[in-house]
Design a protein with these regions (language model features):
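Exposed beta-strand face motif in extracellular beta-rich ectodomains
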Residues: 90-94
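Sec/Tat signal peptide C-region and signal peptidase I cleavage site
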Residues: 9, 21-26
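Hydrophobic core
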Residues: 14-22
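Structural beta-strand segments of beta-rich domains
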Residues: 30-34
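Bacterial N-terminal signal peptides that target proteins for export
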Residues: 1-11
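Aromatic-rich carbohydrate-binding modules that target alpha-glucans
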Residues: 40-87, 100-109
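Conserved structural position at the C-terminal beta-strand
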Residues: 96-98
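Structured interaction patches on ligand/partner-binding surfaces of diverse proteins
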Residues: 100-139
């Protein structure tokens, strides 16, 4: 059964144009990834508002119409965006939200796409994690209620 499950995930990854590492999607070259986990596993309506400096949303992204997730993984959902969209600074600005409900304390968040190709965010936690292992440890320290 486990082999069948992995085969199905691998076929889904091929269809989506992504590569799975374990059960995580590898970020394609030239893109950055934001991974998001919720304790309730309910991602319906949650999206990504992302912009480049000085506050110019990426094409097609509006507050009322956030970017839907690119895909799912064992961690949760993820978004892949083109790093070039963020301009020469490659500063990735974002808010994960559902309507006016915002993650990470409702703050505008950012990270350097030059230094970090991928980040992980746990619901109810303000911290940005730079590895999956850090995110899992963060969840252990702040378990789901």
């Amino acid at each position: 059964m486990h082999i069948r499950s992995l085969t199905v995930k691998a076929l889904a990854a091929v269809a989506l144009g992504t590569t799975l590492i374990g059960a995580q999607a590898q970020v394609p070259e030239g893109k950055v990834g934001i991974n998001y986990s919720r304790c309730d596993k309910n991602f319906e309506g949650w999206g990504l508002h992302t912009w480049k400096n000085p506050g110019i949303p990426l094409p097609g992204v509006e507050w009322q119409k956030p970017m839907p997730p690119t895909g799912t993984s064992d961690f949760g959902v993820y978004w892949h965006t083109d790093l070039a969209e963020y301009g020469s600074s490659q500063t990735v600005n974002y808010i994960i939200h559902k309507g006016d409900s915002k993650e990470q304390g409702g703050k505008d968040m950012k990270f350097s796409g030059k230094e970090n190709k991928e980040i992980w965010v746990n619901s109810g936690d303000r911290k940005i994690y730079f590895t999956l292992e850090e995110a899992k440890k963060g969840r252990e320290e702040k378990p789901c209620q």
